[in-house]
Amino acid sequence: MKQSGPAMYARTLGRIVVRSHAVWIVTGALAVLFGAFLLYSMRTGFIVETFQMALDSVHQSQIRNSDAPEYIQEEERLVASQLQDVVNSFGTKDFAASMATYYRTVADIVQTAFEEGRVDETADSILQNEGTAQLYEKVAQLANPVFYDDSTRFPLTYYTLYMLTQLPFFAWYIPLIIILGIYIHERENAKLLSHVPVSQPVLIFNLFLALFTASLACVLVAWLPAALWTLLNNGFGDPSYPVMFVTNGELFSLTVGEALLKWIAVFVGELALLSLIAAVCLSLNIGKAAQTAVVLLLALPFIPNYLSGTVPQFLLKYLPSTFLDEARITGIPGGAVTIIDSGPGCTFSAGMTTISGWCIAVILLALCACTAVGFMRIARLRRQHA
């Protein structure tokens, strides 16, 4: 059966990507990044020596503070007792409960000392202590309360979120830049966009679909080896495992499952927007401008003080570049509650609204450009036949 012009063109776009050595090299490099912490063990602090050192430190503090007020000595005795329970219960089913009790005790002591003016803590630090206590309390309530102390033992869901938020965000957009560069090269060599048997809107749609699906496929293929290894060796994991983080003066609590879904949603939205911008530029024969625009957008978050002064604060949540680093929205899994600077009002819902709005704006601009190109072609034909 003879294929239509759009179908043949879409097939050509796909064939160009599959046959490109650069695409496979980038995909392989991303696969190595995904599997890095399966090969190189990252310890998270859940080892008995860590808590034994903390206990020794408290004992030394008790000796130094032997003449301190009674309430200080009582606080140190309580902390020492809780730490001793943690050390004694290490490796048993009571370990999670002991950890939760210890961190709750620390959070309450610090909160009281802060209210009484005995410690110089920031509001975020107080929230961080409270978040740590809640994190361990939530873990203790799980059906299987475990602490992941070694990256080589992370289950699939936890490892995936850990790697997605630990590695530089721009790594996941490199395939798009490479594929866009390949299409630009093909256009300049008169192999791709010359005598295209499709209309301008169909051309944009085909280019968008090719850029978006190929880039997404590269990331998925790169993820698969590490995903299969962790699934077979460490299991799927508990999607309800907690993730806590502090941002904009608020304490946020998510599960690993929720955080993964939010990361994927923001990433897919950003990738779609960048692919759309690139497709429109390519269709208008300004491919190099497309590549420059994508690179500049990815580079914006690296501007010094991007979130704290360089860009007006009220504009941040309306810029898609603000949400490129998905970890600012999902938090970073681990035994410590992270303090994340994400910009005022830069939440998941705000990010999805901003990305959707920009996608709609680019589509409208593309329609206007297509209409203008159509009118110019009609005018040129009329002049030729005049």
Language model feature labels by segment:
Residues 312-343:
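Short hydrophobic, aromatic-rich alpha-helical segments embedded in or entering the lipid bilayer
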Residues 1-26:
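Aromatic- and glycine-rich beta-strand/loop motifs that create alpha-glucan
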Residues 194-201:
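Short helix-to-coil transition segments within interhelical loops
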Residues 30-34, 211, 297-301:
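Residue-level recognition of pore/gate-forming positions within transmembrane alpha-helices
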Residues 59-156:
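Long, solvent-exposed extracytoplasmic domains/loops
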Residues 41, 282-319:
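Transmembrane helix segments
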Residues 22-38, 274, 331-386:
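Alpha-helical transmembrane segments of multi-pass membrane transporters/translocases
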Residues 33-61, 138-184, 205-283, 338-357:
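Secretory targeting signals
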